Amino acid sequence: MSRVCQVTGKRPMSGNNRSHAMNATKRRFLPNLHSHRFWVEGEKRFVTLRVSAKGMRVIDKKGIETVLAEIRARGEKY
């Protein structure tokens, strides 16, 4: 399963670790992803999404029905 938020599209990004001597070594910054079940009142069922913490805030703000419609419009499965 890829490390991508199904709502926001956040994915891992790369950067550097910096030691005290300012030596740079490559590292990855991973999104804060969680598998979360959401109740969809219109479909009378739970939907499991892999979402970031920000994705959960977006769902709280817009509503799960609207977010699922956007995911469907992009052609993704959930």
From Swiss-Prot:
What the entry lists under Pfam families is as follows: Ribosomal_L28
**What biological-process GO terms show up in the record?**
translation
SUPFAM superfamilies per UniProt: L28p-like
Determine the domain of life of the protein's source.
Bacteria
Enumerate the InterPro entries for this protein.
Bacterial_rp_bL28 (IPR050096), Ribosomal_bL28 (IPR026569), Ribosomal_bL28/bL31-like_sf (IPR034704), Ribosomal_bL28_bact-type (IPR001383), Ribosomal_bL28_sf (IPR037147)
Q: Does the keyword Acyltransferase apply?
A: no
What Gene Ontology cellular-component terms does the record carry? ribonucleoprotein complex; ribosome
What are the record keywords, sorted? Ribonucleoprotein, Ribosomal protein
Give the Gene Ontology MF terms in alphabetical order.
structural constituent of ribosome
Region annotation (Disordered) maps to 1-22
Family classification: Belongs to the bacterial ribosomal protein bL28 family.
Q: What is this protein called?
A: Large ribosomal subunit protein bL28
- Look up and give the organism this protein is from: Yersinia pestis (strain Pestoides F)
Its lineage reads:
Bacteria, Pseudomonadati, Pseudomonadota, Gammaproteobacteria, Enterobacterales
